[in-house]
Amino acid sequence: MNINTKLLHAYPVICRETGASSIPKFQASTFHQSDVFKHEGYQYTRFGNPTITAVEECIKSLEDASYGLAFSSGVAAINAVLFLLSSGDHLVLGKNIYGGTYQTVHEFLIRFGIECTFVDESHVSAWEAAIQPNTKMFYLETPSNPLLTITDLEAVTKIAKTHQLLVACDNTFMTPLGQETLPLGIDIVIHSGTKFINGHSDVIAGLIATNDEALYQQLKIHQKALGGILAVEEGWLLLRGVKTMGLRMEKSILNAQTMAEYLQQKPQIKQVYYPGLATHRGYETHQKQAKNGGAVLSFELASEEHVHQLFENCQLPIVAVSLGGVESILSLPWCMSHASMPEEERLKMGVTPTLVRLSCGIEDIEDLIADFEQALQS
């Protein structure tokens, strides 16, 4: 089944009870039990809800996985995975990671007695060199946020399996449409459903898919006990938004590729980071494991003055945290997505005051380029 057909038909999209053309919002906190001594079906929305079940079936289908789980945010999904670790365990993860993941590591994992080592994710040998006797998990994010650094999924996963380690991967930037991670040996794939999967900047959601039943059961406990269940309203909106993901992504990816090529030619731009460019350091690896360059790019401006000029004069993109909406979103990671990181750590990973991230929407590309042209020339 091809992707746009799959997005419309490969999971519950019609209400079985009524034939309604969309899954209803089961806006209920609790469910009547016909037999108090035999608990069957739904009981309490924190434990499960028909609308949320449809969302979980959706991500399971999109990832061709055995199990799916929905959470209240991408961070809730990330935390559910990282909390598989126990005191005394060791975690290896890339140094170029999402700021929320970094915060969980430093605010919780280290305090809970879990050792963490950050490595240069683009060097396969760095992952193996970091393994200790108590290492339990590799945590990957490729392309990374915000520098679009590439990790060789197959090679790193092969190392992990040799040492009987779990491998989790944040696949938010590429989506299940652009990068299939589970077939490469990844144990758990994570998405911020807030981003491209929903695609309309009106939902906060996290999603997980896995083929391992034991991991699924443990993550299900985390979902329930940590209280990170997706709200019914959010789930219903996500089910609506995901139907157009194929069409949205096709346009956004084309816009990102064109914008990256345009920005490369501008004297005000020192560097463009986009894995769809042949000049990108991880281009060959990315081409091997992904279907396209994605819809997010970052670029380094020549000076902070140019940064102020761009943000003051750009008119079409909204200026905001997050990404993946139908509208283009411009952000400054230094004081937005990665602001919680110490300045020294931000600079070490390459997040500078002149690094700008652009999530491309579905606008006409001629208008986006014209807007950037006038902003850069102002």
Regions found by a protein language model. Name each.
Residues 257-315, 319-324, 341-347:
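Conserved small-domain helix->loop->beta segment predominantly found in fold-type I
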Residues 64, 268-271, 354:
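Glycine-centered tight turns that cap/initiate beta-strands
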Residues 25-26, 34-54, 58-61, 329-354:
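Glycine-rich phosphate/pyrophosphate-binding loop
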Residues 238-247, 294-302, 357-361:
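Short, well-ordered beta-strand elements within core beta-sheets of diverse protein domains
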